[in-house]
Amino acid sequence: MSRRYDDNPLMNHNHRKQGPSWKKIMGISLCIILAIVVAGGVLIYTIGHELISSTNFVADEDVKTVQEEELPEEAKETVSAEEKKGRVLDESELNEIHQQMNQLSDVDTVEDEDVYNLLLVGVDRRDKTWNGNSDSMMLVSINHTAKRVSVVSLMRDTYVDIPGYGYNKLNAAYALGGGPLLTETITDTYKVDVSRYAAVDFENMIQIIDALGGIDLEMTDAEVEVANGYMLDMCNTLGLNGYDYVLPGGGVYHCNGVQAVAYARNRYVGNSDYARTERQRYVISQIIEEVKRMDVAQLTQFVKDVLPLVTHNVEETEIWDLVTKAPEILQYKFVQDRIPYDNMYDVIYVDSQDMLVPQWETTIEKLHNTIYGDGSISDNSDNDAENKVEVSDEFTDDYPGLLDAETETEAGIVIQQ
């Protein structure tokens, strides 16, 4: 009986040996691709881990707390009775405010797994022997569901109950217990779940902006006058020639770190500290714009330069999550505001300090809507940076001779009495 060619075991075996099957080729190719991906992932993780490890991560339990009497004199900014702006309260009125604040304990803190809250802190200190006051506090909330990033400035003079210490200005919390105490105070006060913070002092902020290559800022004549005074003061502390940094007048400038930080610190032009918080948010927004323009190599170098300057308690897994989502987050809608909101607070004079007392129920409701709701907010910017320009006596006393009569007339400056 005859047998077909392909029925011959020997011939069939030789036929199969002519070359590898497409399945084997695909299998080998996939293994190679997988190996490359894994190797690349390991490399990226290793580089990323080294970068993240270079930051100044401080676990909450390692942050020391101090008593108020241990703080240096500069920690408390007192205001004389003659210069006060707040109402002097009798004991019953102050107790009523405390009772209203105590009722906040009945309000639930909002938690949402689709919202990430991070507190950005700008620290004011002349030496490293203490934590410093939190001169700038911005609550950054990333809402992945609404695809919105809200940046809300929390004014430093807000009257709050600091856990374990009692009633004081909000910025005193950082001086007493660093980032952990500040975030705890904000969580208890505003009923927003925030446990993570990232802090830089002014000297580090200067380095960050310089590493970025500077940022574009538009300033008025009056803002330049005041910023120049801050530049001279900071340069004196840093051992720099301040006159290499001062600006000639109002306009749009590509500012280096000293110039940008001096602009952000200004609370003497416009509506006092309200306008300053707007300037601080303006600086942050310009930093973000510069970061958006960077290519991969520039961004990598910037991250290497900046991370060691930041003190924070953000876990590495959270940083990786933010990094991987960064391209998407940068496309989100950005909104900004500040607390206290317009027409929703009072100013009182307590313990030789002017304090801001928000209408807490409506303030918390509005903040929660900004972060977790539809995000509809009323922009306070117009009221923060009014066209009228005011420069207080406090500034002219600190920097005599910077404001001459001609400049005062041209800029429309009103010296407060």
Predicted regions located by residue number:
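Amphipathic, coiled-coil-like alpha-helical scaffolding segments used for oligomerization/assembly
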Residues: 172-240, 313-315, 319
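Second-shell loop/turn segments in exported
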Residues: 124-129, 168-176, 191-196, 266-275, ...
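Flexible, polar/acidic helix-loop-strand segments at domain edges
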Residues: 210-298
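Sec-exported extracytoplasmic/periplasmic mature domains
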Residues: 141-144, 159, 175, 187-191, ...
